[in-house]
């Protein structure tokens, strides 16, 4: 994988940012998380007057070999069917992108279906789904690197068009499984506590998923001498859509863009990215805490404060997109509210 040069924002501006926010005509801290978000965006952009320009959403699609083990209630056909649905504008992600002015890119990273007849889907297919990580690595290191590079390429495309705030989403049946395993490996949390029902497994289905993922992790430890090493665990368990998202997150941070992070799967990708480059978290805005088991604990691993708590678990980036207007409000607050001096209001604290 390429080396990224991700720098923490220069701290020398933080005092001036806080002073500006504290002197807006309101009680100090009274706008709560909006003030925290405004400070973060100012720090990312290194300015007292931040802007959000040409927001883009990258929707990565890919299938997973582990799906063959019955770890998801949805069949893998749902991946390609939804990808086509997105081209017709009928998905949740489409509606939220339209509502909030995001340019949507639909990317086939590794869907187990020929989607070349759909020109609105960017064909970056690396393979027709990953291998089954119960028995072998999901992909080779070369395939993982190619997926990461694809994510970088797409971020570069958005950035060249003037985008400075970007969101990622995914479509991939069974991708809660690698996400749970990464949470276990990178967070040192018991595996069973990281595994949830995904798209709606019943109790026997959830128990079966736990058995399969336990065996997959055991096999990983047997096959890999340096078990637990981040750079081994990434290609071993990743989906192509997840590797693409990791590349996109790292490249966006390198370009000092604001990265809107969605639910369980995209949070797992950010967790993985932060294992390689901890500085990436400076650029991450966590849209929501979802209803998937373990998501809150995963967010806690990154010391993340999510914006919304709506019980969502759709994926696609929908939770992050829903949170975007709150980020807009934070930016408008720091740019448009008057301060005590200009408003001729007595400062009372």
Which residues fall in each region the model found?
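N-terminal loops that bind phosphate or other acidic moieties
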Residues: 1-349
């Amino acid at each position: 994988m390429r080396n990224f040069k991700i720098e923490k924002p220069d701290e020398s501006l933080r005092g001036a940012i806080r002073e500006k926010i504290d002197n807006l005509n309101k009680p100090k801290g009274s706008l709560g998380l909006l003030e925290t978000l405004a400070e973060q965006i100012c720090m990312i952009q290194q300015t007292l007057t931040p802007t959000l320009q040409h927001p883009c959403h990258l929707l990565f699609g890919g299938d997973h070999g582990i799906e063959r083990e019955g770890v998801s209630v949805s069949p893998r056909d749902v991946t390609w069917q939804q990808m086509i649905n997105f081209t017709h504008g009928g998905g949740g992600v489409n509606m939220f992108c339209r509502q909030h002015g995001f340019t949507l890119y639909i990317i086939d990273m590794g869907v187990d279906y020929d989607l070349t007849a759909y020109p609105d889907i960017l064909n970056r297919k690396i393979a027709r789904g990953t291998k089954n990580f119960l028995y072998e690595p999901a992909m080779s290191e070369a395939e993982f690197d190619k997926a990461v590079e694809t994510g970088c390429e797409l971020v570069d495309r958005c950035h060249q068009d003037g985008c400075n705030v970007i969101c990622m989403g995914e479509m991939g049946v069974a991708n809660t499984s690698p996400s749970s395993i990464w949470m276990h490996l990178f967070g040192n949390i018991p595996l069973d506590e990281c595994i949830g029902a995904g798209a709606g497994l019943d109790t026997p289905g959830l128990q079966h998923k736990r058995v399969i993922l336990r065996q997959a992790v055991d096999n990983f430890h047997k096959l890999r001498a340096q078990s637990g090493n981040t750079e081994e665990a990434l290609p071993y368990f990743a989906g192509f859509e997840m590797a693409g998202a990791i590349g996109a997150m790292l490249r966006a941070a390198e370009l000092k863009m604001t990265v809107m992070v969605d639910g369980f799967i995209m949070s797992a990708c950010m967790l993985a990215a932060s294992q390689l480059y901890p500085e990436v978290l400076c650029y991450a805005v966590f849209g929501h805490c979802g209803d998937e088991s373990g998501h809150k604990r995963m967010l806690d691993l990154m010391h993340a404060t999510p914006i919304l708590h709506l019980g969502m678990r759709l994926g696609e980036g929908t939770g992050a997109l829903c949170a975007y207007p709150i980020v807009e409000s934070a930016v408008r607050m720091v740019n448009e509210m008057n301060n005590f001096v200009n408003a001729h209001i007595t400062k009372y604290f």
